[in-house]
């Protein structure tokens, strides 16, 4: 997205990462971003839920090698957030609760961790003046064969 001066606007990319499968999906997401969009200048933020009463276990990324790979090799920033409403009972709610950990005046794009980046993101016309969410609500899951 171009800003008013005609230059590309910096934005962050946000995914939720936590213990288990989402750790490794976050690593693959970050690796695909760095490979396919090496000129991306924004921050890659891994939003990580913290332990608390809504989690019967510690949801943080517990694989230290993966954590090191994300932060030191792939340049991600891990930011924590508290689960106040969803937690383990509805882990998809982490996407909503992760928003509280973001800087309010900084534009961002939220991706699911099971996404692979296949090309430069500066070709996508994100409009940060008109926030939106995916409108794909039906027929987005494969039909069982």
Regions found by a protein language model. Give the residues of each.
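Glycosyltransferase catalytic domains, chiefly GT-A lineage
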Residues: 1-145
């Amino acid at each position: 997205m171009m800003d008013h001066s005609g230059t590309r606007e910096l934005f962050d990319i946000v995914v939720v990462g936590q213990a288990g499968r989402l750790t490794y999906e976050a690593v693959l997401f970050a690796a695909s971003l760095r490979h396919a969009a090496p000129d991306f200048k924004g921050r890659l933020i891994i939003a990580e839920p913290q332990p608390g009463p809504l989690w019967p276990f510690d949801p943080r990324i517990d694989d230290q090698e993966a954590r090191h790979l994300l932060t030191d090799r792939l340049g991600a920033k891990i930011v924590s957030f508290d689960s106040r409403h969803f937690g383990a009972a509805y882990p998809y709610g982490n996407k909503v609760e992760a928003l509280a950990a973001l800087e309010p005046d900084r534009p961002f794009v939220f991706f699911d961790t099971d996404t692979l980046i296949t090309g430069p993101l500066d070709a996508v016309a994100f409009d940060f003046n008109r926030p939106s969410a995916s409108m794909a609500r039906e027929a987005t899951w494969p039909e069982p064969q």
